């Protein structure tokens, strides 16, 4: 994971690094744990190494002098339902901050009603939800989509747990963090109010 910062400093796009370095590392850790080649403690240590690398990548993601952009607005990022895996949500938050969004990230195990209330109160322009293994996200998706409709925002989802989900019509499945990066470039407020 140390290579993540070095590659970013060489100009590699952060979304590509997350897709090509961090995500495969997480898959290897998860598969090794499922096959009993890693203990729970070892799986947690490996996952924490990825979390630390994502945290270190944040300053490298943000363009100098371009903090939150008023044309972007707020993005809410969470791992839905009982989902305990929030590393993809952390990577998503990092990318969205780099795109100029003010990011509110409750991350893991965010209850559906609390998530919807946060979307409404923050007037979120973009809601990015992830699920690695969970399957109890129908209520979160339904409520987040309803809240986003009221704020004029978009809802995007990703992760293996979302592949089988019944998505409301206005919710878009994204297969990669590159897709999120591209989606974020067109999301947000359409004009700045003075």
Where are these regions (language model features)?
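Peripheral docking tails and interdomain loops at the edges
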Residues: 159-194
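Conserved hydrophobic helix-helix packing surfaces used for dimerization/oligomerization
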Residues: 73-75
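Short phosphate-binding/catalytic loops that engage adenosine nucleotides
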Residues: 12, 100-102, 152
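Cofactor-cradling patches in redox/metallo enzymes
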Residues: 95-97, 110-167
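Long amphipathic alpha-helical segments
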Residues: 1-67
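A general structural motif
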Residues: 81, 85-87, 106-113
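Short helix-loop-beta junction
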Residues: 90-104
């Amino acid at each position: 994971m140390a290579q993540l910062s070095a590659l970013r400093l060489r100009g590699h796009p952060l979304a590509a690094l997350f897709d090509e370095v961090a995500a495969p590392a997480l898959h290897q850790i998860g598969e090794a744990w499922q096959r009993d080649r890693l203990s729970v403690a070892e799986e947690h240590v490996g996952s924490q190494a990825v979390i630390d690398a994502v945290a270190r990548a944040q300053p490298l993601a943000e363009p100098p002098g371009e903090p939150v952009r008023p044309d972007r607005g707020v993005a809410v990022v969470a791992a839905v339902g009982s989902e305990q895996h929030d590393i993809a949500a952390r990577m998503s938050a990092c990318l969205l901050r780099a795109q100029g969004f003010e990011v509110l990230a409750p991350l893991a195990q965010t209850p559906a009603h609390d998530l919807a209330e946060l979307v409404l109160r923050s007037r979120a322009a973009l809601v990015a939800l992830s699920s690695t293994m969970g399957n109890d996200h129908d209520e979160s998706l339904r409520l987040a989509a309803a809240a986003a409709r009221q704020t004029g925002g978009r809802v995007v989802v990703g992760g293996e747990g979302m592949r089988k989900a019944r998505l409301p019509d206005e919710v878009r499945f994204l297969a990669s963090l590159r897709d999120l990066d591209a989606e974020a470039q067109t999301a947000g407020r359409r004009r700045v109010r003075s």
